[in-house]
Amino acid sequence: RIPSSAASDVYKRQLVIPSVAFGGLRLALLVLFGVLFWGAVDLWDSSMETLALMGLSVFLSVIVGVILGVFCGLSDRFERGMKPVLDTMQVMPAFVYLIPAMFFFGIGGAPAILATMIYSMPPIIRLTNLGIRQVPNETIETATAFGSNKLQTLFKVQVPLALPSIMMGVNQTIMMALALVVLATFIGAQGLGSEIWVAIRKLDVGWAMEGGLCVLLMAIMFDRFGKALSKEKTTLPADSQRFYLLPQNWEIY
């Protein structure tokens, strides 16, 4: 099913405009090519379903993961308790997460979101913990000396300094979520995974290739978008941002 042109244009703007704002023209062209490809191969609705499932899963995973990562970074005892849990979560096969989710929530989108959220959580917890622990003690002592309490030091000093590591964890979480969202078709989740599975059952190589390319483009887009968000923003001086039709130092020629 192909959505109406008006709705399609709205979705394209919602995807392309943030790419221009955070990643520049190159990322925007990549995202535009991706969304046009989704529509060209008649997999727009499936791509949007996968995008919605993954977006909600990543949102919940990042919220819970950052909170747990901060606790790990502030407490050695909490980190020792979480480490074997995270190690176990990362060595378990992806299909194992689908079984308890299906047992408690049945078949559909809800168990897919739960399984994806849990499966993609370890990277954001580990990298948030790493970022918090890498903040220099001198910086924390300076903030305390200027009268900051523990919460102010955490939210105004430690978390901002740990933000590059946290954003790297968000990027890894997105990649892991995309991997499991495709597999979640086995518990009734709709999206690109179901399209690929039906194509494989029918031995339709072209259809399966189209679905795989859609997943590949989605992964590349989110990887580049995550890297663009994690980069430090640098601004040019006001005079350097102006556009001049003729060179200003023409007298040297």
Pin down the residues of each PLM region:
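Transmembrane-helix boundary motif in ABC transporter permease subunits
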Residues: 17-20, 34-45, 57-86
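Glycine-rich helix-loop "coupling/hinge" segments at transmembrane-helix boundaries
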Residues: 103, 132, 177-218, 234-239
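Single conserved hydrophobic/aromatic residue that forms the stacking wall/gate
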Residues: 2-7, 11
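Transmembrane alpha-helical segments of polytopic membrane transport and secretion proteins
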Residues: 6, 224-253
